[in-house]
């Protein structure tokens, strides 16, 4: 099978929350720079996800990562695309692969039975900034 674009990259699930400036200031106190990407421990990220869910509900979810974003965009513009990546056999890994397929991107990925989870990226969006507190072990 011939593809227009093949990518190799990290399989990330973006969890996007809308936030206000008050939460942005609280993030800065935690050492999370506004408008940047910050690696954080899994427990800290889970605590923030729980806090944001309590404040505003469930996040929007999408497969993500730099290569994934590129291959999905190309697919949505009509290119025949393929993504090569690694995911764990967990909810995020399954969601990632389903979302790739839903966006017309081929893959041959089989989820690994791993102690390391598929990585989520917490995307916080305010009216002025996009901030990425992330953790991606697989």
Describe each model-derived feature in a short phrase.
Residues 86, 108-113, 121-130:
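Conserved phosphate-binding/catalytic loop of the ribokinase/pfkB sugar-kinase fold
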Residues 1-84:
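Glycine-rich phosphate/adenosyl-contacting loop at the front of the ribokinase-like
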Residues 129-138:
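Single conserved hydrophobic/aromatic residue that forms the stacking wall/gate
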Residues 50-56, 81-107:
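A glycine-rich beta-to-alpha transition motif near the start of alpha/beta enzyme domains, typified by
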Residues 17-20, 96, 123:
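Short acidic, glycine/serine/threonine-rich loops at helix termini
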Residues 24-25, 100-102, 126-127:
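Short, hinge-like loop/turn segments at secondary-structure boundaries
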Residues 12, 88, 137:
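Short, glycine/serine-rich, charged loops/turns that create anion-binding
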């Amino acid at each position: 099978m011939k593809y227009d674009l093949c990518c190799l990259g990290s399989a990330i699930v973006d969890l996007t929350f809308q936030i206000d400036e008050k939460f942005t200031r609280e993030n800065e106190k935690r050492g999370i720079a506004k408008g940047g990407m910050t690696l954080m421990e899994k427990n800290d990220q889970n605590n923030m996800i729980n806090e944001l869910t309590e404040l505003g509900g469930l996040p929007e979810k999408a497969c993500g990562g730099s290569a994934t974003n590129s291959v999905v965009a190309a697919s949505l513009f009509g290119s025949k695309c393929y993504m090569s990546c690694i995911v764990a056999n967990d909810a995020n890994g399954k969601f990632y692969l389903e979302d790739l397929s839903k966006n017309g991107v081929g893959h041959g990925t089989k989820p690994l039975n791993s102690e390391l989870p598929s990585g989520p990226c917490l995307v916080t969006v305010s009216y002025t900034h996009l901030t990425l507190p992330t953790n991606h072990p697989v």
